[in-house]
């Protein structure tokens, strides 16, 4: 190939960019969003739905968009056409767009104009654009032909952190400049003399004690707002800023953010601010906070826009998410807390408990045994009954269902349970169940067919009552169906119950934190030896002594399956069955996804609610399929959405220890609680979900540290994926069979995300996030990739096992199953199951206790992972793969993954490197007539790479690993087969590829920007008949070795040998560079500037011959490139 | 996580406290000197972006040899006084500050100009890289006024997308430009130091404070952006082999046999910008949003919005979100 061809091929082109949203602007009913150098245009309909109309690509080259300015139309007609100035960094471009009738077309774009300095603000002045530049100067620019008309500096030359231009003509142009010294400088560029001598500031305003990041001027009211590093927003009365010498008065100093404030925007009636704390606050002009929008994740909100007519605020975050919020001033209509004025001379006694039957009926009992009903339609209290047997102790629970099934139940301290039909309380039925106190009551409803009431009595006995109604509706029947027995514990009662569809089992939670499974109809378990065993009082030592006699009396059925203490000592608070899973919540601040397989309960995933919500009280499934979490955060009751990370409702109820009830129907959500001797009711019309908050889902809120492609799912034509991103560019036939790459990413935000990247649409869908890590995730490894059903009975889709590891020396193992699902936007369903976890500090604590070691946890981080598998083509052989971890404490550790990842066990370690180990990588070596060999390479901050032979590590009697000094401690890995000093400092990327000659190419990239490539030969010593027993150690040697010292200008964090002739590298200098291999030194072919800063990891894979290769770059964002082979 | 956790994760942070340095950065300058003998023969030095002052501490000890040298330290932030160091509080990119610094060297130029300047990073990478480059260029502009021919200039540099443009700019003024990374600077950090030796401005160059030095742009040379001809200066790792590894987590009992004792920070920050906000937060006095307050049910039904009394002073709540170091 000639030199020129070489220079062009292969050429990487950007397919997809996920970056912080740094520019947002509403134009009519359209939303402009900047993402990297691209402009995204969305249509907003009145419901607040957002539909992407078009991506206008690459407006700013390698700059990122920071803002848009739409040229004002004198005729006010922006509905069919608009001229938009797009700026960011030092770049400016003008683009003309026609967008009538929802069809969007780019009519014209100017050149990309490079300024000499950073652009802080831009403003249209009669067809030209004024720009406020980085060192406090203003230029007037003709954006059509690209020439500078004016260039006026300020006498006070300094760097700015923000600027705001005001006025519509050059003559009246005013700049408010935010200097790094925290001052605001107001000056008038047009007062410059013809020679453009610097202009002196007209006014200096100080007040903030940190730099000013954003400003907004409201001409109609003469107000200026500023947002600062000092975490405050200031409101200034400035009058008409275009008039020199005016008075500036600070009329508001608003502290509400708990971190730096990035953005501020003045509206006619509100002030909007947003910042690093991910909160968007709505203030009155007087400085009161009216609303707070929380939901973005990570490092903050970077852009805000407002649609004043629709009263929407739109925010864009570092998480690349875009959200829409409703401006309603002081709270949502139809939402509020009211006291139901129970106290009255006609209603004696004090309130003891409250419950809700649907969202319209409140029930309450008093300490004189009175049961009262409050109907919100009638708006008055009515006594249903009075029974003095319930005066000293009384439990009250209404039946579930939208109208509470019209039933409630009472229970007292003497084992009495009363079931009351609310409409005909006289038909109430009493049941004397126990000799002692009823500890708890709960209901379980199956469709509208089966209703059970469970009551816990002394000794862990749970009576299960079957409730049915007469066809007339006038009478009810209560029949005891059976009794269950809970596992022994101090506080031995159940707390919640639910039917497991189809209805053969009941799932219960107990006060001890266990989740239990009981047969719903034990009569069906007649056959001996099948199903649960009846436990007798004699067998259950702590069972109630109620029956008095010592003979074997059957007290109840034990659980068929249980997860002991799943939620810890504080207890389980709810169980819910939905979509094939069981969800349990607890006062440990977590909720679990469980499932029942073969009559056994199995945990799938543990999830945490928002910070501070340590008491989760329950879950609700919203009609749109999303879930909300109910719980208590200090004194507040909170409804929280895991999907939008938003606190949907906050009620200051005083905490969860008092009696409370929650109900959610389509019409309204209600929360009732007792406070100051009265019943309080919070109600929100329209249910607990707020519509259309998320315009676009965010990805990770913080830096992405690792990316790994898992595999590809092929969808048949029946799953045709609509191309939203490029509706125009779609050529007929290009829909094809949908190929979707599945990629996982790990982030400093402590989550692992599963992404679907279709090859046809250039979109990314976040399928699921795994939130088990307590610290940042830094490394991922995948093994056992297959299809659902396995090789024998293969179904479309993808299965794999994943290990993730990171800060606090924590490692998790989970399995992934992705199947086609036409009902989701991504056309995929993703199921995750958590398999196991490991924490080094816990392990050390155990060993310290056992061996009196004095090893103190040095807060180790895992930096990199590699699956080491000898026979990946023959899974199931041997004890399971190993996973090697590079550790910051200087160790390389080997873990054994047994039982498909259900057991994670620390096997061996070595402190050979004595430095922070940055990378591990493994490969196998094959040679004719020889056993396949498994080689691990590890590389550290001193630039050395060590090679280890792990072939026989798992063999019985192998000497690869030296036994530990104490049993239970890890084995020692001995000395490496070879070490190579590849670099003078840290190795940030490492890859190998077998060569046709039977050797291996090893490539590494370093912190100093250098590349190192060498050929490694693996030789086995001749087998000597005499000592066939002794282990053979391969001899590794370096054949030819090359260094490229200044390959990149920063850390080389990604390297991949694509073929023995071609290599690609990626660096923090934002270059993706191709290198030709094979004739001596690697030679530069070409490089592409990409947009993601701080790239920490790269993965490349071939898709298919037509599509070529794909490459994912992960850093402060994610970008996907592709190139043809 | 306890207070020792940062000591475990960052050995240089811990050593700095134990050795009385105001910041761990002191080791960076010491390791740079180990490699380049920066302080040899230096009598007058400028420390730009000096707060909290660990580089000034190092300079005041090492500069001047027997006779006392002169160190001028400049920072935006207030800095606790140091014996023998002249302090200027101001923005080094501001004309007036630059003039004030230059005054001190009229007639007697400096031998060494160092700048460890870093903006308070915003997390938007392009902004941060730009702001950092402006500090370097402002420092370079000051250096062109105060540095004697053959003098040395050391400045922090972020190795991002456009770093090669800065290298080519520095090469105009110095006979040797290297990129150095002390071992005490982490692998995971994009910071490095441009070590520029042999100040030798182009013939006919007239320093001009009033016009800021602008970074070059790629416009003139496509090869600088995509091609192989970028100016990537040689890279040097500094610090001897036995130096601690700043990326490694060490257990509290280091191998040198010394027993660990917790040391509080040498010099806490003086009046950081977030001080007032933290104080308010601590006292639960940050403004809180409107929460539906109590009112009777009839009012709820009659009014489209419930009435509320807004409280500006919220009750004390647990503070677990932001770590106020004040
Ligand atoms: C990394 S610290 C320097 C630490 C210092 N070398 C030491 O050893 O203690 C960076 C300093 O740059 C300062 N800085 C940032 N922008 C500045 C500016 N425009 N003018 C002056 N100082 C600035 C900050 O206030 C901060 O103190």
Curated annotation (Swiss-Prot), chain A:
Function: Together with methyltransferase FTSJ1, methylates the 2'-O-ribose of nucleotides at position 34 of the tRNA anticodon loop of substrate tRNAs. Required for the correct positioning of the substrate tRNA for methylation. Required to suppress amino acid starvation-induced autophagy. Enhances the STK11/LKB1-induced cell growth suppression activity.
Protein's UniProt keywords contain Transcription: no
Descriptive protein name: tRNA (34-2'-O)-methyltransferase regulator WDR6
Gene name per UniProt: Wdr6
Subunit note: Interacts with FTSJ1; the interaction is direct, and required for 2'-O-methylation of position 34 in substrate tRNAs. Interacts with IRS4. Interacts with STK11/LKB1.
Family of the protein in this entry: Belongs to the WD repeat WDR6 family.
Sequence ranges of the WD repeats: 89-130, 155-197, 207-246, 256-294, 295-335, 346-384, 433-475, 489-528, 567-605, 611-650, 652-692, 725-765, 767-798, 860-905, 912-958, 982-1024, 1047-1085
GO MF annotation terms: enzyme regulator activity; insulin receptor substrate binding; tRNA binding
InterPro entries: Quinoprotein_ADH-like_sf, tRNA_Anticodon_Mtase-Reg, WD40/YVTN_repeat-like_dom_sf, WD40_repeat_dom_sf, WD40_rpt
């Amino acid at each position: 190939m000639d030199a020129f061809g070489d220079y062009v091929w292969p050429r990487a082109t950007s397919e997809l960019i996920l970056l912080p949203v740094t520019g947002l602007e509403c134009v009519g009913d359209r939303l402009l969003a900047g993402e990297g150098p691209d402009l995204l245009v969305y249509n907003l309909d009145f419901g607040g739905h957002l539909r992407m109309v078009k991506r206008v690509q690459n407006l700013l080259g390698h700059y990122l968009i920071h803002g848009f300015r739409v040229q004002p139309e004198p005729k006010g007609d922006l509905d069919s056409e608009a001229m938009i100035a797009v700026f960011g960094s030092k770049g400016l471009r003008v683009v003309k767009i026609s967008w009538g009738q929802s069809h969007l077309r780019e009519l014209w774009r100017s050149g990309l104009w490079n300024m000499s300095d950073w652009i802080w603000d831009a403003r249209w002045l009669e067809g030209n654009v004024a720009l406020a530049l980085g060192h406090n100067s203003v230029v007037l620019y003709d954006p059509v032909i690209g020439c500078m008309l004016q260039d006026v500096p300020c006498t006070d030359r300094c760097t700015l952190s923000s600027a705001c231009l005001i006025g519509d003509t050059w003559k009246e142009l005013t700049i408010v400049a935010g200097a790094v010294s925290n001052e605001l400088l107001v000056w008038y560029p047009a007062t410059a003399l013809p020679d453009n001598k610097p202009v002196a500031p007209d006014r200096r305003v100080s007040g903030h004690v940190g730099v000013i990041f954003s400003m907004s001027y409201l001409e109609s009211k003469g107000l200026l707002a500023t947002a600062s590093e000092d975490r405050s927003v200031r409101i200034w009365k400035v009058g008409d800023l275009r008039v020199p010498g005016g008075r500036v008065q600070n009329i508001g100093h608003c502290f509400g953010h708990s971190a730096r404030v990035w953005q501020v925007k003045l509206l006619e009636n509100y002030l909007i601010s947003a910042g690093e704390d991910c909160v968007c606050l709505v203030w009155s002009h007087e400085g009161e906070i009216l609303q707070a929008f929380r939901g973005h994740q990570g490092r903050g909100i970077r852009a805000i826009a407002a649609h004043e007519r629709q009263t929407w605020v739109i925010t864009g975050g570092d998480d690349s998410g875009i959200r829409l919020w409703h401006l309603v001033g002081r709270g949502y209509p139809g939402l509020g807390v009211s006291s139901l004025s129970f106290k009255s001379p006609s209603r004696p006694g004090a309130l003891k408990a409250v419950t809700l039957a649907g969202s319209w009926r409140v029930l309450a009992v008093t300490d004189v045994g009175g049961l009262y009903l409050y109907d919100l339609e009638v708006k008055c209290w009515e006594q249903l009954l009075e029974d003095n047997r319930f005066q000293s102790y009384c439990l009250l629970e209404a039946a579930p269902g939208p109208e509470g099934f019209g039933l409630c139940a009472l229970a007292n301290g003497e084992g009495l349970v009363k079931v009351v039909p609310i409409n005909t309380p006289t038909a109430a039925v009493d049941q004397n169940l126990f000799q002692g106190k009823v500890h708890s009551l709960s209901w379980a409803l199956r469709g509208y067919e089966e209703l059970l009431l469970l009551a816990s009595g002394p000794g862990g006995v749970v009576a299960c009552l079957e409730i049915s109604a007469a066809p007339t509706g006038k009478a009810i029947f209560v029949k005891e169906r059976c009794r269950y027995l809970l596992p022994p514990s101090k506080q031995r009662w159940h707390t919640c119950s639910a039917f497991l569809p189809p209805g053969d089992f009941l799932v219960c939670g107990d006060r001890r934190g266990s989740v239990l499974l009981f047969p719903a109809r034990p009569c069906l378990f007649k056959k001996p030896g099948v199903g649960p065993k009846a436990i007798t009082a004699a067998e259950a030592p702590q069972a109630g002594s109620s029956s008095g006699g010592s003979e074997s009396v059957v007290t109840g059925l034990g659980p068929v399956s249980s997860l002991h203490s799943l939620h810890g000592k504080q207890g389980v608070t709810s169980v819910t069955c939905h979509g094939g899973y069981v969800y349990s919540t607890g006062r440990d601040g977590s909720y679990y996804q469980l499932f029942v397989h073969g009559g056994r309960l199995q945990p799938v995933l543990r999830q945490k609610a928002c910070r501070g919500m340590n008491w989760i009280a329950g879950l609700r499934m919203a009609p749109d399929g999303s879930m909300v979490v109910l719980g208590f955060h200090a004194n507040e009751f909170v409804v929280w959405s895991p999907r939008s990370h938003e606190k949907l409702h906050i009620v200051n109820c005083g905490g969860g220890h008092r009696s409370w009830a929650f109900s959610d129907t389509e019409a309204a959500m209600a929360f009732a609680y007792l406070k100051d001797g009265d019943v309080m009711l919070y109600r929100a019309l329209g249910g607990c979900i707020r519509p259309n908050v998320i315009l676009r889902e965010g990805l990770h809120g913080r830096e992405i540290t690792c990316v790994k492609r898992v595999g590809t799912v092929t969808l048949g034509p029946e799953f045709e994926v609509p191309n939203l991103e490029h509706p125009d560019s779609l050529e007929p036939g290009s829909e094809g069979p949908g190929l979707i790459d599945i990629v996982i990413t790990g982030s400093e935000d402590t989550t692992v995300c599963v992404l679907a990247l279709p090859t046809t649409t250039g979109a990314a869908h976040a399928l699921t996030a795994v939130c088990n890590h307590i610290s940042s995730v830094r490394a991922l490894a995948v093994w056992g990739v297959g299809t659902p059903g396995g090789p024998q009975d293969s179904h479309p889709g993808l299965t794999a096992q994943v290990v993730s590891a990171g800060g606090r020396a924590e490692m998790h193992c989970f399995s992934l199953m992705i199947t086609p699902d036409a009902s989701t936007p991504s056309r995929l369903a993703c199921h995750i199951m958590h398999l196991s976890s490991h924490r080094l500090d816990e392990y050390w604590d155990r060993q310290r206790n056992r061996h009196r070691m004095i090893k103190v946890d040095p807060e180790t981080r895992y930096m990199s992972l590699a699956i080491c598998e000898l026979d990946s083509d023959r899974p199931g052989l041997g004890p399971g793969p190993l996973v090697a971890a590079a550790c910051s404490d200087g160790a390389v550790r080997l873990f054994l993954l047994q039982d498909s990842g259900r057991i994670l066990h620390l096997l061996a370690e070595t402190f050979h490197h004595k430095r922070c180990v940055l990378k591990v990588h493994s490969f196998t070596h094959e040679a004719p007539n020889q056993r396949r060999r498994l080689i691990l390479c590890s590389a550290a901050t001193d630039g050395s790479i060590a090679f280890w032979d792990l072939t026989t590590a798992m063999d019985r009697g192998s000497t690869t690993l030296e036994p530990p000094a104490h049993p239970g401690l890890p084995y020692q890995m001995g000395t490496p087969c070879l070490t190579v000093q590849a670099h003078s400092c840290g190795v940030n990327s490492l890859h190998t590829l077998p060569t046709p000659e039977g050797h291996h190419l090893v490539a590494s990239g370093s912190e100093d920007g250098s590349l190192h490539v060498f050929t490694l030969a693996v030789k086995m010593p001749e087998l000597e008949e005499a000592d066939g027993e002794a282990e053979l150690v391969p001899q590794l040697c370096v054949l030819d070795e090359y260094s490229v010292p200044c390959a990149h200008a920063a850390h080389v964090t990604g390297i991949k040998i694509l073929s023995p002739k071609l290599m690609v590298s990626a660096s923090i200098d934002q270059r993706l560079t191709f290198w030709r291999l094979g004739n001596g030194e690697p030679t530069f072919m070409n490089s592409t500037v990409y947009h993601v800063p701080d790239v920490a990891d790269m993965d490349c894979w071939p898709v298919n011959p037509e599509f070529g290769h794909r490459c994912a770059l992960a850093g402060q964002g994610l970008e996907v490139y592709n190139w043809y082979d | 996580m306890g207070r020792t956790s940062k000591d475990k994760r960052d050995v240089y942070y811990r050593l700095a406290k134990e050795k009385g340095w105001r910041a761990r950065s002191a080791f960076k300058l010491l390791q740079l000197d180990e490699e380049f003998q920066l302080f040899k023969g230096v009598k007058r030095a400028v420390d730009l972006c000096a707060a909290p002052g660990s580089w000034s501490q190092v300079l005041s000890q090492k500069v001047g040899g027997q006779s006392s040298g002169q160190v001028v330290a400049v920072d935006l932030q207030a800095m606790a006084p140091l014996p023998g160091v002249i302090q200027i509080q101001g923005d080094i990119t501001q004309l007036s500050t630059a003039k004030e610094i230059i005054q001190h060297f009229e007639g007697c130029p400096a031998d060494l100009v160092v700048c460890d300047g870093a903006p308070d990073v915003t997390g938007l990478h392009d902004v941060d890289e730009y702001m950092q480059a402006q500090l370097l260029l402002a420092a370079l502009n000051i250096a062109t006024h105060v540095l004697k021919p053959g003098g040395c200039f050391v400045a922090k540099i972020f190795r991002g997308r456009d770093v090669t443009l800065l290298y080519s700019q520095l090469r105009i003024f110095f006979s040797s430009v290297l990129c150095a990374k002390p071992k005490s600077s982490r692998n995971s950090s994009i910071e490095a130091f441009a070590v520029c030796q042999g100040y030798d401005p182009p013939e006919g160059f007239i320093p001009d404070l009033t016009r800021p030095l602008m970074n070059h742009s790629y416009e003139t040379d496509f090869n600088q952006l995509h091609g192989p001809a970028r100016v990537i200066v040689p890279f040097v790792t500094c610090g001897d082999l036995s130096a601690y590894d700043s990326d490694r987590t060490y257990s509290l009992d280091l191998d040198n046999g010394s027993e660990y004792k917790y040391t509080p920070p040498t010099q806490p920050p003086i009046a950081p910008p977030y001080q007032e906000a933290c104080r308010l937060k601590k006292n639960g006095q940050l403004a809180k949003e409107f929460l539906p307050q109590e009112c009777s049910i009839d009012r709820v039904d009659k009014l489209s919005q419930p009435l509320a009394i807004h409280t500006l002073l919220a009750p004390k709540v647990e503070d677990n979100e932001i770590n106020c170091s004040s």
